[in-house]
Amino acid sequence: MAIELRECAGIAQFNTGSSKCLLDPGKVKAIILTMHGYKLPANATAELLEAACHDDRPNRIFPIKTIIEYAPSGGEANKNATGYGPNKITSYSAKDDVWTVDEYDASLKANIMAAKGVAFDAYFVDENNVVYGINDGTDILAGIPLAGIYPGGQDWDSSGTEANLTVGTMFKDYEKYVKNADYRVYKFDVVEALKGLVYVELVKQDTGENNYKLKEHFGNLDVTSFFGAALSEGASSCFDGEVSAVKFENGNLVITATGTPSLKSPKVLQENGVVGIEQWKA
């Protein structure tokens, strides 16, 4: 009769050797957020990552860049002794790291604040095009589950410090992450390929029957000149609202339509050469 034997869980899969070529972790330059359970594209290329940034939800990835400072916090062993016995590890403290972004961005801060209840997965990208995640037993690198993200930093300049933005990442289970940590190394500029989206609005002008401006939702910045040429080339491919013609002239988008024009999805825009924007919907 077969006898089932128990293995010691602590050392059943335990070794202390080193890789023939140890990875030298670089400075993290970007964070990629995904909806929980969703992953980066398999066999990722720069083109696939850019497309994923513009994909329809929930497949879309959400990059935050460029990171210029890292302040780790937590993830330390919690120890406790019973009576006069030795200390034993009972658990690990919550891991709550803070990342500083290179420029203060009120729009990004507002978006992160609004997502306080969302449990994202996260990938971290370093300066050497290494993407860090976890091994979930499949061939595709998975993101690190987070309990949440939050913004911080300083909203205005002071005598010694300029306004700055930080992003906090709260690990859902730091011990599980360390046990399953993994990474992929790419041969293209991962950070450059990442294109976060900005909310914009199409605003009809009083001057000219068909004149429109494109403005950022947060801050009302006129960005017509940045996207006007590409949107006019895409014409009806970039717009809903039964648009028949689009011209970019004198700083305006001149849109001929029988309905109310609005931008198509970021996925469609990106396929037509318009990168980095999404129509704001109240």
What residue ranges belong to the model's regions?
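Polar/acidic, low-complexity leader/linker segments enriched in S/T/G and N/D
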Residues: M1-K65
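Extracellular/virion structural assembly segments
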Residues: N43-Q154, G160-A163, Y174-V190
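Generic recognition of long tandem-repeat/solenoid scaffolds
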Residues: V101, F124, G168, N210-E216, ...
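Short, surface-exposed beta-strand/loop "edge" segments at domain boundaries and coil↔beta transitions
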Residues: A106-N111, D126-D136, N220-S225, T260-S265, ...
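C-terminal edge-of-domain segments
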Residues: L165-F171
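Beta-strand-rich domain onsets/edges
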Residues: F188-N210
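Beta-strand-rich structural segments
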Residues: K204-F226
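The feature marks long extracellular or luminal low-complexity segments
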Residues: S225-A282
